[in-house]
């Protein structure tokens, strides 16, 4: 068994066979050699693509299925090895504790159209260790029946919130389509006479007109979510089932998904996008009498007013403009800027309470 003493580089080396295998998997996926068993996945450059590769190799080598949100509860080789040694089945849940520590009031973030919470990883960390941060992933992603309306999503997520925080005031936020669900959650809380201390919308429009044809979402899977170019896999004007097969094969060759990632899993993801898009299209926001903050990019300027249309539903909306575009607003260099705006708003709301 390897020694637990730190090596020459200060990293703690693996101490048993499980840690050794996991460390090899992490190094191969991340293409980084200087990793120890106590290094945080996100600190060493981990992303959702890396996480997908790692869980795929773990599935083959250990015969265990780890959900992507494992990287928030077990963010080191050491803690992940503990899960694998325990051999217990991991519960799938909608509410993911992405940063559960801290003394401030928790902030709850709703998933985007993709259904996972990985978009919020950098924002959660940029908010600092004193800000508890929980993310909601879609029920279909978490292993149960998907919710088909925004209202149903909001009801389900409010039940989960109260397991962490039984009474208000609550702090809610959402990026893109997640902001629409957060809005409905605040409206439902008002009906329960439960206060919402903060409602934060990040580059969110109140009304959407998302395409509902399968071809659009197949193309989007190829471009955005699997990192593939349509031209590279020659998808143009081919039937959807052939496109899906080509996407899967190209993604496996590029190690963007595990080798045993099957067509059923890709089909499930496609159905999730279609269901979520239909739910957002059908929803019409209700008036909300509480205060809210809209953090928006300059990109969202195609004829919309400063509030992106939210002024029709509230008189108490503040707007904060931030650089970047819609797809990058909460990641990379933008994450600390958004986090600063969020923290400032939460502090102001707390002082004004």
Language-model segments: what does each one mean?
Residues 1-92, 151, 155, 204-211, ...:
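Phosphopantetheine-dependent thiolation modules in NRPS/PKS and related acyl-activating systems
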Residues 78, 82-353:
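A hydrolase-biased, glycine/serine/histidine/acidic-enriched motif that marks catalytic-domain neighborhoods
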């Amino acid at each position: 068994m390897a020694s637990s003493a730190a090596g020459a580089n200060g990293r703690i080396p693996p101490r048993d066979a499980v840690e050794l295998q996991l460390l090899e998997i992490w190094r191969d996926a991340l293409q980084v050699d200087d990793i120890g068993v106590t290094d945080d996945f996100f600190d060493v450059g981990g992303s959702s693509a890396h996480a997908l590769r790692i869980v795929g190799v773990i599935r083959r080598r250990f015969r265990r299925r780890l959900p992507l949100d494992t990287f928030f509860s077990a963010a080191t080789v050491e803690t992940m090895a503990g899960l694998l040694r325990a051999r217990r089945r991991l519960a799938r849940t909608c509410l993911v504790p992405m940063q559960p520590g801290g003394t401030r009031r928790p902030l709850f973030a709703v998933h985007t159209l993709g259904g996972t919470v990985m978009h919020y990883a950098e924002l959660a960390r940029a908010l600092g260790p004193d800000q508890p941060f929980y993310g909601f992933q879609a029920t279909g992603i978490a292993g149960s029946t998907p919710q088909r309306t925004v209202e149903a999503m909001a009801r389900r997520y409010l039940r989960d919130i109260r397991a962490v925080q039984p009474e208000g005031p609550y702090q809610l936020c959402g990026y893109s389509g997640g902001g629409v669900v957060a809005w409905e959650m605040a409206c439902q809380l008002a009906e329960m006479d439960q206060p919402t201390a903060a409602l934060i919308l990040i580059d969110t429009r109140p009304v959407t007109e998302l395409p509902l044809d399968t071809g659009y979402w197949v193309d989007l899977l190829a471009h955005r979510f699997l990192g593939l170019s349509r031209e590279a896999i020659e998808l143009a004007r081919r039937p959807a089932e052939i496109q899906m097969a080509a996407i899967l094969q190209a993604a496996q060759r590029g190690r963007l998904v595990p080798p045993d990632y099957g067509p059923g899993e890709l089909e499930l993801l496609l159905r999730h996008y279609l269901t979520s898009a239909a739910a957002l299209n059908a929803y019409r926001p209700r008036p909300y009498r509480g205060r809210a903050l809209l953090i928006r990019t300059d990109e969202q300027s195609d004829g919309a007013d400063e509030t992106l249309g939210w002024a029709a539903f509230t008189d108490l909306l503040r707007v904060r403009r931030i650089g970047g575009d819609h797809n990058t607003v909460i990641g990379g260099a933008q994450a600390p800027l958004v986090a600063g705006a969020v923290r400032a708003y939460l502090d102001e709301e707390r002082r004004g309470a």
